[in-house]
Design a protein with these regions (language model features):
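Class II aminoacyl-tRNA synthetase catalytic cores and aaRS-like
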Residues: 1-437
Length: 437
């Protein structure tokens, strides 16, 4: 109710979009619905109302929203369900800042009205690149500080071959200073931190402890004579635990140590459940490289606009292109994602081509959208906060199953009615389907 009241006051129209739609590639697998009337053809349940809300903007609707049910056939986890609800919003003639302002004010209003929480008057912003560099994730939990630092310079001043090899290969050495925790971390507890790093492909976790100006344990012997220099550059002091990940791949070093940071936050009780720490992550890459298929994939989806400064060089180096993309993060969870959309049909065709759709395939899959653009699409953008995940965090839970009536379990099964279930042969025959063993 609070969401509807807020958006309606801003002249948003609540419009329902279809539930049976055309199957289009949007990232996750579609849930498919076979057609009885058209053998061999299928509807899909919407992963989001993305294309319909863009067509609404073309149709002259200035501001739209709906409380949308969405369906994605993907692996389950604690903060994810195969069916979920999002607050879907779209606006014409807006910039990124306009969308962010409307969204921030909505969260401030809703949190105050529902749970009496006063949120910050302005949510901080960080670029995707800085989020990876400082926190090792694009979903940083900023309820505690503990930022990662660059320590590639240690390859020069120490004798540790792991650091030297990583830097020589063009990689990185990342460091964390855990203040005052040297005495509390035994070798066994450090091995638990190392296990967290190895999940993200780190080869190991280097460490040492600061004690009386000297280093003890771990890589201490490789740092002899330069302890003071290291402590000064890392702002470390007596009683601190120093942790390092080195890797030939910069992102691996960052994400692996970022996982260690996240575990430390939990282990050291740094995650105050009564604090709501919102953060905007902006300037995402528009594309990401798919190693398995050797092609570029959209980082979010194919309808997000590149930043204007990249328009002339899109095809030359897709990996360098930043999109007009933004995510809202709350306490380490992504709670909303959005972008300024492409409204030029020729630019949309260029994006299709970069991600591997030839003109015929693009026309078959998305011709209805590019045809609509020909009638004059306004610049537009939007965002879609995930309602279930937001309620989970407001309630202090760690699984959205705790705030959903009749949730699916981690195997995507409904314990209440035991769906999915078998159907009889007559139903299958009516749908022109047969089950292969």
């Amino acid at each position: 109710f609070a969401v509807r009241e807020y958006l309606t006051a801003l002249n948003f129209l609540e419009i329902e979009t279809p539930t049976f739609i055309k199957s289009t590639p949007e990232g996750a697998r579609d849930y498919l619905v076979p057609s009885r009337l058209y053998p061999g053809k299928f509807y899909a349940l919407p992963q989001s109302p993305q294309l319909y809300k863009q067509i609404l903007m073309v149709s002259g609707f200035d501001r739209y929203f709906q409380i949308a049910r969405c369906y994605r056939d993907e692996d389950a986890r604690g903060d994810r369900q195969p069916e979920f609800t999002q607050i879907d919003m779209e606006m014409s003639f807006v910039s990124r800042d306009d969308v962010l302002d409307v969204t921030e004010n909505m969260f401030r209003t809703v949190f105050k009205k529902t749970i009496g929480a006063d949120l910050a008057q302005s949510f901080p912003r960080i670029s995707y690149d800085d989020a990876i560099d400082l926190y090792g994730t694009d979903k940083p939990d900023i309820r505690f500080e503990m930022k990662m630092q660059d320590a590639a310079w240690m390859a020069e001043c120490t004798e540790f071959a792991v650091f030297k090899d990583a830097v020589a290969a063009g990689g990185a050495v990342k460091a964390l200073v855990v203040k005052g925790q040297a005495a509390n971390y035994s070798r066994k507890k450090i091995e638990e931190l190392e296990a967290a790093a190895k999940i993200y492909k780190a080869k190991g976790l280097a460490w040492t402890k600061v004690a009386g100006g000297a280093f003890e344990g771990g890589i201490a012997k490789y740092c002899a004579g330069v302890e003071a220099e290291i402590c000064k550059k890392l702002n470390a002091g007596d009683g601190d635990l120093l942790l390092f990940v080195a890797d030939a791949k910069y992102k691996t070093a960052c994400t692996a140590l970022g996982a260690v940071r996240s575990k430390l936050g939990k282990d050291l009780n740094l995650l105050d459940p009564n604090v709501f720490a919102f953060l905007w992550v902006i300037d995402f890459p528009l594309f990401e490289w798919n190693e398995d298929e050797q092609k570029w994939d959209p980082a979010h989806h194919m309808f997000s606009a590149p930043q204007e400064r990249y328009l002339d060089t899109l095809e030359q180096n897709p990996g360098e292109v930043k999109g007009d993309l933004y995510d809202l993060v709350l306490n380490g969870y992504e709670v909303a994602s959005g972008s300024i959309r492409i409204h030029n049909p020729e630019l949309q065709k260029r994006i299709f081509n970069i991600v591997g759709f030839n003109p015929a395939d693009a026309e078959k899959k998305f011709g209805f959208l590019t045809e609509a653009f020909k009638y004059g699409a306004p610049p537009h953008g939007g965002i879609a906060p995930g309602l279930d995940r937001i309620v989970m965090l407001m309630a202090g839970e760690t699984s959205i199953k705790e705030v959903i009536a009749f949730p699916k379990n981690t195997f995507a099964v409904s314990p209440m009615d035991e769906s999915p279930s078998e159907v009889d042969e007559k139903q299958l025959a009516e749908l022109h389907l047969s089950i292969r063993e």
